[in-house]
């Protein structure tokens, strides 16, 4: 399960891997490998040394099963290409009419809270009758989430994003780990950094850009995410 995979990530991290990456089951059908039918997700774990030792460690403590051990450069590159194409695969798996804006795109939590992040997504899907595609950098708790829902239900994004970000912040996480805030997430910046820091951001912006020329409508003077009205 996703939560068991999150627990495994904590143990794997202690073995000093060079990478721990994650994709959920929605992308597995795109790879030329026969996964077991009950596979919920896949962790890509890479080591630079002590391969046999770490392989045995994983067998001893991992809840999931080792699907494949790759040592040749060609085969390793094949698996990493699959991971790198997760975004493309995720889009292919979503029907055009079920593609809605990605506001809760790449939140990040402390690794020990990764299971909580998956639980939050599970509850939101149940409450709003949505589905999700997830992939990301499990080793540092950074998970990319794409909501699947009919565009006619786009207004639910407001409540989903508000609930999700509030709970991510409560876990000690950040609403975006890689992609920045932009128009989509700027209205949540004050919640992330607090009123004192937010006022400081505004003063810095007013000092260097009093005419609002650079990136207007972002971070300190957020405007409503226009896609919500137009899609």
Feature roles, as predicted:
Residues 1-231:
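Noncatalytic alpha-helical scaffold of FAD-dependent oxidoreductases
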């Amino acid at each position: 399960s996703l939560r068991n995979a999150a627990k495994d990530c904590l143990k794997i991290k202690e073995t000093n891997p060079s990478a721990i990456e994650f994709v959920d089951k929605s992308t597995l059908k795109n790879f030329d490998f026969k996964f077991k039918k009950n596979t919920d997700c896949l962790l890509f774990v890479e080591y630079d040394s002590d391969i046999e030792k770490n392989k045995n460690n994983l067998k001893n403590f991992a809840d999931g099963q080792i699907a494949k051990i790759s040592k040749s450069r060609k085969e390793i590159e094949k698996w990493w290409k699959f991971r790198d194409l997760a975004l493309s695969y995720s889009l292919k798996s979503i029907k055009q009419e079920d593609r809605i804006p990605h506001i809760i795109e790449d939140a990040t939590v402390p690794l020990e809270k990764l299971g909580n992040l998956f639980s939050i997504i599970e509850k939101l899907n149940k409450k709003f009758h949505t589905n999700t595609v997830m992939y990301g950098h499990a080793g540092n708790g950074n998970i990319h989430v794409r909501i699947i829902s009919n565009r006619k239900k786009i207004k639910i994004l407001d409540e989903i994003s508000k609930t999700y970000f509030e709970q991510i912040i409560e876990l000690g996480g950040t609403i975006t780990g890689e992609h920045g805030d932009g128009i989509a997430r700027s209205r949540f910046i004050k919640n992330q950094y607090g009123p004192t820091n937010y006022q400081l951001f505004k003063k810095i912006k007013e000092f260097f850009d009093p005419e609002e020329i650079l990136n207007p409508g972002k971070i300190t003077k957020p405007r409503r995410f226009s896609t919500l009205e137009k899609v």
